[in-house]
Regions:
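Extracytoplasmic cell-surface/polysaccharide-interacting catalytic and binding patches
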Residues: 3, 32-113, 127-208, 214-230
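N-terminal twin-arginine translocation
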Residues: 10, 29-31
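Bacterial N-terminal signal peptides that target proteins for export
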Residues: 6-17
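Short, well-ordered surface patches within globular domains
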Residues: 121-122
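Segments that shape or occlude catalytic/ligand-binding pockets
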Residues: 118
Length: 230
């Protein structure tokens, strides 16, 4: 997605107060599955060489719901192979851990919709929606998701997704992180809780998508990776 950064976050906002607002704002969407119990298997040699880690090693209670591993995405078909994992660059580890820790006292859990995204998948996404306002045009370098340095996340409470006002990859102005028109007060509050928690982990909001957060160096051009997502 474009490299714009989010507006300054109000760090004085009390997370637990916001969570009280959120408590009545759980969506009626079908429950999402929790991450499997047990140890997390090692990442592939290629992923390890790229500095990638499985997000469950640093956020063990993470809920993994990779949309591009299913047909529940705007392309309508799975784009990731079976066994796809949420891989992120190790530079995001401490930040994601801090964000998750900030949410736990309020009974909230991070849900990961996308993490590292292979270049060929980015190409297919842009072919489906060739509009750089909505989908980043793939280039000669990797950055953001293609470099494993951005994540698409939402929140869950008790296994139910919170109501954020849109679904993932909503190509609409109300997907803007700070949208007010067409976004209820509760939905705005839910987005603020997510944004504030991610800010505690030094993860920057991309304004155009409330679910997208960039880690350190996300906008830096890097060589395109040949790392399988499974």
């Amino acid at each position: 997605m474009p490299d714009n950064r989010g507006m300054p976050v109000n760090h004085r906002m009390n997370l637990l107060f916001s969570a009280a607002v959120v408590a009545g704002a759980v969506s009626s969407a079908a429950p999402v599955s929790a991450a499997p119990d047990g140890g997390v298997p090692p990442v592939s040699a290629a992923a390890s060489a790229a500095g990638f880690i499985d997000v469950r090693t640093i956020v063990p209670d993470a809920i993994i719901d990779l949309r591009y591993a299913t047909a529940n995405n705007f392309v309508g078909v799975p784009l990731y192979p079976p066994g796809a994992r949420c891989l992120v660059h190790e530079s995001l580890g401490a930040g994601l851990s801090a964000a998750a820790a900030a949410l736990r006292p309020a009974g909230l859990t991070l849900v990961f919709w996308d993490c590292y995204r292979p270049h060929d998948v980015q190409v297919r996404l842009f072919e489906a929606v060739p509009n750089p306002n909505w989908v980043a045009e793939p280039g000669d370098y990797a950055r953001s998701h293609e470099a494993g340095r951005s994540v698409d996340v939402t929140l869950a409470s008790g296994g139910q997704l919170l109501d954020m006002g849109t679904d993932f990859d909503a190509f609409s102005p109300i997907a803007n992180a700070y949208a007010t028109d067409g976004v209820t007060t509760r939905q705005q509050a839910n987005r603020s809780v997510l944004r504030n928690a991610m800010a505690k982990g030094w993860l920057a909001q991309y304004v155009g998508e409330w679910w997208h957060f960039d880690g350190p160096g996300a906008s830096v051009d890097r060589p395109i990776l040949d790392v399988p997502v499974n």
